[in-house]
């Protein structure tokens, strides 16, 4: 691959910025004081661990992690095996069933197999207090993930950005549409999916774009690690 830059190469400096160290410190001290924070510390940066910068083909932006027990593990929209598939992801599966021939809804919501194929599942805020949506929204994570998006915009070419809902669309406003392929739709949440997420055809359009560029399309059927061996 021509672009061998890693996340470490492009983010090392950002991770030394005072705001970022502050964010980490705040999260760490909340954990130490007994507050339950999701995802667990070891999983906070999983999106970057599973999808290296040079491998990014598709970016799906989420908002903040799931705040129920055992759900969040560092990949947007994904939940651990054995945890009930959340409503937004069920609606994503419904759209896949309606548009991808042969897609059958899996009995889990674990999307690591997407991440391993180059789908960056990036929440714009990387931690949350148990049971309190958006509780870490002002800690500095948004500044960090803005930087991540600008680095993908700058260092990669031909990435598909799937921007669902106004939050993701605002966040993605900086993306150069001459360099990248930006697709927008309402959020897959039950509150908005019927306003145009269903029928947006984004999973098909993303693959068509990748194929036109001579890249391998994404297999959108999520498989558990044991199934793919």
Curated annotation (Swiss-Prot):
Enzyme's top EC category: hydrolase
Disulfide bonds: none
Chain segments annotated as coiled-coil in the UniProt record: none
Main location: cytoplasm
SUPFAM superfamilies noted in UniProt: Uracil-DNA glycosylase-like (SSF52141)
Protein's cellular compartments: Cytoplasm
A Gene Ontology biological process term: base-excision repair, AP site formation via deaminated base removal
SMART domains (UniProt xref): UDG, UreE_C
The keyword Acetylation belongs to this UniProt entry's keyword annotation: no
PROSITE patterns named among the record's database cross-references: U_DNA_GLYCOSYLASE (PS00130)
Record-linked InterPro entries: UDG_fam1 (IPR002043), Ura-DNA_Glyclase_AS (IPR018085), Uracil-DNA_glycosylase-like (IPR005122), Uracil-DNA_glycosylase-like_sf (IPR036895)
Active site: 64
Membrane spanning stretches: none
Catalytic activity: Hydrolyzes single-stranded DNA or mismatched double-stranded DNA and polynucleotides, releasing free uracil
EC number, UniProt record: 3.2.2.27
GO CC terms: cytoplasm
Keywords of the record: Cytoplasm, DNA damage, DNA repair, Hydrolase
A GO MF term: uracil DNA N-glycosylase activity
NCBIfam families, sorted: PRK05254.1-1, PRK05254.1-2, PRK05254.1-4, PRK05254.1-5, ung
Protein name: Uracil-DNA glycosylase
Gene transcribed to yield this protein: ung
């Amino acid at each position: 691959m021509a672009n061998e830059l890693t996340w470490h190469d492009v983010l090392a400096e950002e991770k030394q910025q005072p705001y970022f160290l502050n964010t980490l410190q705040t999260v760490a001290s909340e954990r130490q004081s007994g507050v339950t924070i999701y995802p667990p510390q070891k999983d906070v940066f999983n999106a970057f661990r599973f999808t290296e910068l040079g491998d990014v083909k598709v970016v799906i932006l989420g908002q903040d992690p799931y705040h129920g027990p055992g759900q969040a593990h560092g990949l947007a929209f994904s939940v651990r095996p054995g945890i009930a598939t959340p409503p937004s992801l069920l609606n994503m599966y419904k759209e896949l069933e309606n548009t991808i021939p042969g897609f059958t809804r899996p009995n889990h919501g674990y999307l690591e197999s997407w991440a391993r194929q180059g789908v960056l599942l990036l929440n714009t805020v990387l931690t949350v207090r148990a049971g309190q949506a958006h509780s870490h929204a002002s800690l500095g994570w948004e500044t960090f993930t803005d930087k991540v998006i600008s680095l993908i915009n700058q260092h990669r070419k031909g990435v598909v950005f799937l921007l669902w809902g106004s939050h993701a669309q605002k966040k993605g406003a900086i993306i150069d549409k001459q360099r990248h392929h930006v697709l927008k739709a309402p959020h897959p949440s039950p509150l908005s999916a019927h306003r145009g997420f269903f029928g947006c055809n984004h999973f098909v359009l993303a693959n068509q774009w990748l194929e036109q560029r001579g890249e391998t399309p994404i297999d959108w059927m999520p498989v558990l690690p044991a199934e793919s061996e």
